[in-house]
């Protein structure tokens, strides 16, 4: 069990996956009626939620959008008992994966908007000593800009 205030600190990205599914046969160059799902994602966000589900009370160092969708991501993490006090909410703070699936459920196309993780460096410069001295361990996303971790 975690003994320090910040428990396991997870550092990395938040993504929101936007997935579209057609009601009928998918027409790539036409209009397709269907339904769209918004799913909170990102490897680090997923990992911190999984750690919280084990009741280890982790801390997340990440960036969310300063939008209703970003607020929803933070609220969901808080409901899972993730410490979000060091998260920042900024414009375009989250990554987005837009995916369209065909009528068989296979991926027909996608676009990924990568988040700017440099503001995590600001969090570490402002609160890094406090975060690290009050944690049990740190999990860092590997796909992070080198400047954020050096």
Task: Please describe what each predicted stretch is.
Residues 2-14, 76-89, 101-150:
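Ribokinase/PfkB-type carbohydrate-kinase core domain
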Residues 70, 95, 146-148:
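Short, well-ordered alpha-helical microsegments
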Residues 61-66, 84-94:
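Beta-strand->loop->alpha-helix junctions that form or flank phosphate-binding loops
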Residues 1-63, 68-72, 79, 97:
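Glycine-rich phosphate/adenosyl-contacting loop at the front of the ribokinase-like
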């Amino acid at each position: 069990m975690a003994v320090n205030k910040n428990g396991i600190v997870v550092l990395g990205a938040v993504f929101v996956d936007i997935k579209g599914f057609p009601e009928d046969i998918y027409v790539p160059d036409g209009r397709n009626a269907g339904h769209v799902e918004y799913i909170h994602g990102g490897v680090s966000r997923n990992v911190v939620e999984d750690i919280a589900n084990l009741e280890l009370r982790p801390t997340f160092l990440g960036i969310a959008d300063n939008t209703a969708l970003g607020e929803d991501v933070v609220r969901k993490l808080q409901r899972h008992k993730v410490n979000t006090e060091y998260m920042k909410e900024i414009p375009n703070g989250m990554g987005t994966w837009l995916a369209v699936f065909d009528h068989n459920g296979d991926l027909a196309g996608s676009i990924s908007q990568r988040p700017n993780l440099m503001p995590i460096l600001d969090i570490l410069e402002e609160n890094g000593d406090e975060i690290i001295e009050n944690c049990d361990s740190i999990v860092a996303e590997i796909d992070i800009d080198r400047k954020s971790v050096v």
